[in-house]
């Protein structure tokens, strides 16, 4: 098992979500490119054969779709692990962790949501990270 801090553990979902969105964007970009490859706009009739470039692009698109699906499944699995951990933290500490690491809000947004100052929210966050680290130690999860 990988050794990580509480913060690294919690931030895993943000990275996995970013990767899934990146795969989705690439899939959509390639889908758009296939459309432009397969349409000839010269007004002349053409056969129904699929060109080699279009066929290759379609195969790449299928591969991209699989990578996107795998990335989304990974993000959902990690999200659930992080969510389950955060659910064990009560009070404002749990709320701050939820907004930061599940809803992926920025600190400014969290300050507004929970009516805390910038310094106050970071103080709560430090306490929350300590609680997560204590929980990781109790559960036998490796931390540094």
Where are these regions (language model features)?
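N-terminal interaction/assembly modules
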Residues: 1-85, 134-144
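Helix-turn-helix DNA-binding module
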Residues: 103-120
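Juxtamembrane/interface motifs at transmembrane-helix termini
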Residues: 116-119, 131, 142-143
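DNA major-groove recognition helices of helix-turn-helix
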Residues: 121-135
């Amino acid at each position: 098992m990988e050794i990580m801090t509480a913060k690294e553990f919690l931030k895993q979902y943000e990275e996995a979500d970013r990767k899934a969105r990146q795969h989705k964007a690439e899939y959509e970009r390639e889908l758009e490119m296939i459309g432009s490859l397969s349409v000839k706009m010269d007004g002349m009739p053409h056969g129904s054969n699929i060109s080699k470039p279009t066929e290759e692009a379609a195969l790449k698109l299928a591969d991209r779709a699989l990578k996107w699906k795998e990335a989304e499944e990974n993000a959902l699995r990690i999200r659930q692990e992080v969510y389950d951990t955060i659910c064990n933290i009560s009070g404002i500490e749990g709320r701050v962790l939820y907004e930061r690491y599940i809803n992926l809000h920025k600190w400014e947004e969290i300050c507004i949501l929970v009516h805390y100052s910038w310094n106050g929210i970071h103080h709560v966050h430090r306490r929350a990270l300590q609680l997560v680290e204590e929980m990781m130690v109790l559960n036998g999860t490796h931390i540094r």
